[in-house]
């Protein structure tokens, strides 16, 4: 990455406090147009707090933030119109049908009825869900719900999509297939900002930042980080950065462990 790259997210000195607790402590970074940017760290590191601020859902305590060309303080609605968002729970309503979910989110994103109908047809054909059009979301396998949720999140063709722990709760094979969808979106020019605590997934990103206790401890390409810390994989990079000795790792509470593909 270099200065000629167009920035789509600029964050300077972001702070988010809850009382005296700093969930985000002076974060500064840039995300470039068209890249897959990994926002990594253990559970509780501050990733979800930051992503909700970048999406315009929460107000920061302080700092300068520009997303998709818009100021997060004064142009929140413009930010929301130019981004997509998918959470770990897949952002779908389980008590309505596949088509009703597509229609609902298309309306939220401001698409016309004609656009919704056309894109719904294209989406269901691409995902091979044409025969599931009128099925409740709750009846679909978890992997299919995940695919549909991501497709709905980019239904309006946003400049940028935020994926907050999108592969949580699914098996390793399904996670790998989901990343194929992410690559396809990136190939269409959509910037992908993904948070995860699966360090294996860092290998799929163009660049990654690693959060520790509300701060960005390091940021670079996966290969550069592995070279810098002289290790073979991103899990070992995380352990080095977090200053956790390997023999102490198994003593951590489960929520702080970095999960690995089996």
Regions found by a protein language model. Give the residues of each.
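Conserved ABC ATPase "signature" region
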Residues: 103, 107, 114-132
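Conserved ABC ATPase signature
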Residues: 95, 136-143
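Conserved ABC transporter NBD signature motif
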Residues: 63-71, 78-79
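Catalytic Walker B motif of ABC-type/P-loop ATPase nucleotide-binding domains
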Residues: 161-165
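ABC ATPase "signature
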Residues: 219-220
């Amino acid at each position: 990455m270099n200065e000629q790259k167009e920035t789509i997210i600029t964050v300077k000195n972001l702070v988010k406090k809850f009382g005296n607790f700093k969930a985000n402590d002076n974060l500064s970074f840039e995300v470039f147009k068209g890249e897959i940017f990994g926002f990594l760290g253990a559970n509780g590191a501050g990733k979800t707090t930051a992503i909700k601020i970048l999406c315009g859902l929460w107000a920061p305590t302080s700092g300068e933030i520009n997303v998709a060309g818009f100021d997060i303080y004064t142009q929140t609605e413009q930010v929301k119109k130019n981004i997509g968002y998918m959470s770990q729970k897949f952002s779908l309503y389980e008590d309505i049908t596949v088509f009703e979910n597509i229609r609902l989110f298309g309306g939220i994103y401001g698409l016309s009825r004609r656009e919704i109908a056309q894109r719904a047809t294209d989406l269901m054909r691409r995902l091979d869900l044409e025969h599931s059009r009128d099925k409740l979301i709750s009846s679909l396998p978890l992997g299919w719900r995940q695919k549909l949720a991501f497709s709905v999140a980019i239904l309006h063709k946003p400049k940028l999509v935020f994926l907050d722990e999108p592969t949580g709760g699914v098996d390793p094979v399904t996670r790998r297939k989901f990343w194929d969808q992410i690559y396809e979106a990136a190939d269409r020019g959509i910037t992908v900002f993904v948070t995860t605590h699966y360090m294996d997934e860092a290998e799929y990103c163009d660049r990654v930042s690693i959060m520790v206790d509300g701060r960005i401890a390091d940021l670079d390409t996966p290969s550069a980080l592995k070279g810098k810390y002289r290790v073979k994989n991103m899990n070992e990079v995380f352990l080095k950065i977090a200053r956790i000795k390997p023999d102490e790792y198994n003593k951590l509470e489960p929520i702080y462990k970095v999960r690995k593909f089996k």
